[in-house]
Curated annotation (Swiss-Prot):
Propeptide cleavage-removed residue intervals: 37-63
Keyword rRNA processing: no
Keyword terms: Glycoprotein, GPI-anchor, Hydroxylation, Lipoprotein, Membrane, Proteoglycan, Signal, Vacuole
Organism: Oryza sativa subsp. japonica
The name this protein goes by in its record: Arabinogalactan peptide 3
Post-translational modification: O-glycosylated on hydroxyprolines; noncontiguous hydroxylproline residues are glycosylated with arabinogalactan.
PANTHER family in alphabetical order: ARABINOGALACTAN PEPTIDE 1, ARABINOGALACTAN PEPTIDE 3
InterPro entries in the cross-refs: AGP3/12/13/14/21
Location of this chain's protein in the cell: Vacuole, Aleurone grain membrane
Lipid-acceptor residues (GPI-anchor amidated serine): S36
Functional description taken from the UniProt entry: Proteoglycan that seems to be implicated in diverse developmental roles such as differentiation, cell-cell recognition, embryogenesis and programmed cell death.
GO cellular component: aleurone grain membrane; side of membrane; vacuole
Length: 63
């Protein structure tokens, strides 16, 4: 039972972090010029990396 609560809390935290990353990304200054070489990380990329990492962590905790 406690592991399900921990799992639910971790999923909620991952969604919250992903949402906040999207909001922070949208509130940033205008994008640099294409010739500057600076690349911004999209919120979908952050979510694509964060969600499997949380799932892997939770999978290791359950064992």
């Amino acid at each position: 039972m406690a592991s399900r609560i921990l799992y639910a809390a971790a999923v909620v935290a991952a969604v919250a972090v992903s949402s906040l990353a999207g909001v922070a990304y949208a509130a940033d200054a205008p994008a640099p010029s294409p010739t500057s070489g600076a690349a911004a990380v999209s919120s979908s990329l952050v979510a694509a990396v964060l969600c499997p990492a949380v799932a892997l962590l939770l999978g290791n905790l359950r064992q």
